[in-house]
C-alpha cells in the first residue's frame, strides 16, 4: 500500500471532528416569518445568541417591559407552537418565596393566555401561539405577555421595574 493511500483517510478523520464542532457552535438562525411579522408591526428588536427575538417596550407610567419571541417551535402531534416570554420576577435565593410561588400559580389559573414558569432564577410568563400565527395574533400574544408580566412585576416587587 502506498503511503499516500493512508494519508487521505487520516486527514479525513481529522477534519470530521472539526466540521462537526463548527456545526455545533453555529448560532441558530432567527425565524424569517417572525422577523417579517415584527418588522411589519414596526417593532424594534434584536436577535440574541439563541436566534430568538428580544423586544423592549415602553409602557404606561414610565415603565418598560422585556419580551422574547422564540424562533424555535415545539410540536405535539399535529400541533406546532411558538412561545412568547416576558419575565417579571427574579429571586435572590435558590427558591421562590412561598407567597410569590403561590401568587404565580394563582395567576396561571386565572389568566387568559399562558402560564408562569420558572426559568433559572426568574419567573417568566410564557404564552404559546400557533407557530404559523398571523402578525395580528402574534401581536396580541406579545401585548398580553408584556402587560400581564409588567403588572405582576409591579405587584411582586413593590413597583420596581427591572424588566
Describe the role of every protein-language-model region.
Residues 15-17:
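N-terminal signal peptide c-region/cleavage motif recognized by signal peptidases
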Residues 1-8:
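Bacterial N-terminal signal peptides that target proteins for export
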Residues 157-163:
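Short, highly charged C-terminal tails/helix-capping segments
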Residues 25-32, 95, 132-139:
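Soluble non-cytosolic domains of exported or imported proteins
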Residues 49-51, 59, 71-73, 85-88, ...:
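A mature extracytoplasmic/lumenal domain signature
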Residues 21-77:
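N-terminal secretory signal peptides
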Amino acid at each position: 500500500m502506498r503511503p499516500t493511500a493512508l494519508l487521505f483517510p487520516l486527514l479525513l478523520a481529522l477534519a470530521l471532528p472539526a466540521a462537526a464542532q463548527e456545526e455545533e457552535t453555529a448560532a441558530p438562525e432567527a425565524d424569517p416569518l417572525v422577523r417579517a411579522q415584527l418588522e411589519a408591526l414596526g417593532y424594534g428588536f434584536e436577535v440574541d445568541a439563541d436566534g430568538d427575538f428580544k423586544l423592549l417596550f415602553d409602557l404606561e407610567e414610565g415603565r418598560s417591559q422585556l419580551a422574547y419571541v422564540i424562533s424555535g417551535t415545539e410540536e405535539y402531534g399535529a400541533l406546532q407552537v411558538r412561545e412568547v416570554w416576558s419575565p417579571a420576577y427574579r429571586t435572590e435565593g435558590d427558591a421562590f418565596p412561598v407567597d410569590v410561588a403561590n401568587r404565580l400559580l394563582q395567576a396561571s389559573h386565572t389568566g387568559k393566555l399562558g402560564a408562569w414558569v420558572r426559568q433559572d432564577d426568574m419567573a417568566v410568563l410564557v404564552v404559546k401561539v400557533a407557530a404559523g400565527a398571523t402578525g395580528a395574533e402574534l401581536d396580541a400574544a406579545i401585548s398580553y405577555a408584556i402587560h400581564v408580566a409588567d403588572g405582576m412585576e409591579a405587584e411582586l416587587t413593590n413597583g420596581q421595574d427591572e424588566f
